Curated annotation (Swiss-Prot):
Its main location: cytoplasm. Residues 203-222 bind DNA. The keyword Hydrolase does not apply. The gene is codY. GO terms for molecular function: DNA binding; DNA-binding transcription factor activity; GTP binding. This is Global transcriptional regulator CodY. It holds the Pfam family HTH_CodY. PANTHER family: GLOBAL TRANSCRIPTIONAL REGULATOR CODY (PTHR40062:SF1), GTP-SENSING TRANSCRIPTIONAL PLEIOTROPIC REPRESSOR CODY (PTHR40062). DNA-binding global transcriptional regulator which is involved in the adaptive response to starvation and acts by directly or indirectly controlling the expression of numerous genes in response to nutrient availability. During rapid exponential growth, CodY is highly active and represses genes whose products allow adaptation to nutrient depletion. It comes from Geobacillus thermodenitrificans (strain NG80-2). The modification Phosphoserine is found at residue 215.
């Protein structure tokens, strides 16, 4: 395959993913195929987002690292010293992707490191490694193209997380604002009693202790449940099982209590 055909292969993978998130493993496998090298997509914290192996490396530490999907902390930290593509790093470098304890076995091992940037910050690193053959300009063009795609995907995921967090918070705030003063008071006592995200409570006991009617507690729980903030299930004489579904709820409730 020439450079154009290899680029088209990456594009075909992206078009196939149209409308859905790009799978980092799939991206690594495509790059592995067109560049003919081991490929590792590493997050800024060293998490292995995706990888593909062209040349198997028989080393227990490497096997464990791939199983745990986590690069060593020190190695990950050192990667931030590399701010532009660094091709053909040899086995004696601290940046080699080959196991240094087996230098004799991997004398011809070469590593290329490509920073993954986006939104003005470092998002991760694309690491390529292979034996015997140097990475040429075509390989580097493909690697940098791949790193750009991965960077865009990481940014998209981050934006979705921020959007989801904002949506969850808004739902909680609307649910809490729908409660009357006595219902809010009841909810505060309920979750003081639960002391966690799920548990069992007897509504009548709380009603007697706080001095409110049982119907106030039932109405408050019903409002939160209809908003999707909690789920509740009556267990008859045992009481009511309650579980928090929205992780922003307890935080927002705590804020109200401290104001």
């Amino acid at each position: 395959m020439n450079l154009l055909e290899k680029t088209r292969k990456i594009n075909a993978m992206l078009q196939k993913a149209a409308g859905r998130p790009v799978n980092f493993k799939e991206m690594a496998e495509t790059l592995c195929d067109v560049i003919e090298a081991n490929v590792f997509v590493v997050s800024r914290r060293g998490k292995l987002l995706g990888f593909a192996i062209k040349q198997s490396i028989e080393n227990e530490r490497m096997k464990r690292m791939l199983e745990e999907r986590q690069f060593p902390e020190e190695y990950t930290r050192n990667l931030f010293n590399i701010t532009e593509t660094s091709p053909n790093i040899d086995i004696n470098s601290e940046y080699t992707a080959f196991p240094v304890e087996n230098r004799d076995l991997f004398k011809t091992g070469l590593t290329t490191i490509v920073p993954i940037n986006g939104g003005g910050e470092r998002l991760g690193t694309l690491i390529l490694s292979r034996l015997d053959r140097e990475f040429d300009n075509d390989d580097l063009i493909l690697a940098e193209y791949g790193a750009t795609v991965v960077g865009m995907e990481i940014l998209r995921e981050k934006a979705e997380e921020i959007e989801e967090e904002a949506r969850s918070k808004a739902v909680v705030q609307m649910a809490i604002s729908s409660l009357s003063y006595s219902e809010l008071e009841a909810i505060e006592h309920i979750f003081e009693e639960l002391d966690g995200t799920e548990g069992l409570l007897v509504a009548s006991k709380i009603a007697d202790r706080v001095g409110i009617t049982r119907s106030v507690i039932v109405n408050a729980l019903r409002k939160l449940e209809s908003a999707g903030v909690i789920e509740s299930r009556s267990l008859g004489m045992k009481g009511t099982y309650i579980k928090v579904l929205n992780d922003k709820f307890l935080t927002e409730l705590e804020k109200l209590k401290s104001n």
